[in-house]
């Protein structure tokens, strides 16, 4: 069977959970895994070889500014030394696609930075971008792999 237009998944049909609590004010979310590689020079070859030696998990979430949640997380670190780690779960669930649901769970998520104040006279809705790292992930529910 061939791909049909209705099989594509709408980016609007998703949810994000932080330690089980839905983050309804999410606008965009992206998590990436990048392999760490070492260069290996091999005798008799002009091209450099590469050996995978590990992986690194990073991401960015953009939220509509409706709470002080990330400001308080950063303040707790600065004032008290408390640096919490979280679990994030991203859910894709576009019923009209017929592809099922995908859940990706990120473990040991730590936020790198947060905007602690911001004003913008031209903005219709204030946003805050929060970069993060994570140390493990799982895919407990996958989209269909066949059409």
Curated annotation (Swiss-Prot):
Gene3D superfamilies: Phage tail tube protein (2.30.110.40). InterPro entries: DUF2001, XkdM-like_sf. Pfam families: DUF2001. To B.subtilis XkdM. This is Uncharacterized protein YqbM. It comes from Bacillus subtilis (strain 168). The lineage of its organism: Bacteria, Bacillati, Bacillota, Bacilli, Bacillales.
């Amino acid at each position: 069977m061939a791909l049909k237009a209705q099989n594509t998944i709408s980016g609007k049909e998703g949810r994000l959970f932080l330690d089980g609590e839905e983050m309804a004010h999410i606008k965009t979310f992206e998590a990436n895994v990048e392999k760490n590689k070492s260069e290996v020079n091999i005798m008799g070859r002009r091209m450099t070889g590469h050996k995978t030696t590990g992986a690194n998990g990073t991401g960015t979430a953009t939220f509509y500014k409706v709470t002080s949640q990330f400001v308080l997380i950063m303040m707790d670190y600065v004032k008290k030394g408390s640096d919490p780690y979280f679990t994030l779960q991203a859910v894709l669930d576009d019923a009209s696609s017929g592809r099922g649901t995908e859940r990706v769970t990120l473990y040991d998520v730590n936020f790198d930075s947060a905007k602690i104040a911001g004003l913008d006279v031209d903005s219709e809705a204030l946003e805050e971008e929060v970069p993060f790292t994570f140390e493990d992930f799982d895919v407990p529910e996958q989209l269909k792999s066949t059409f």
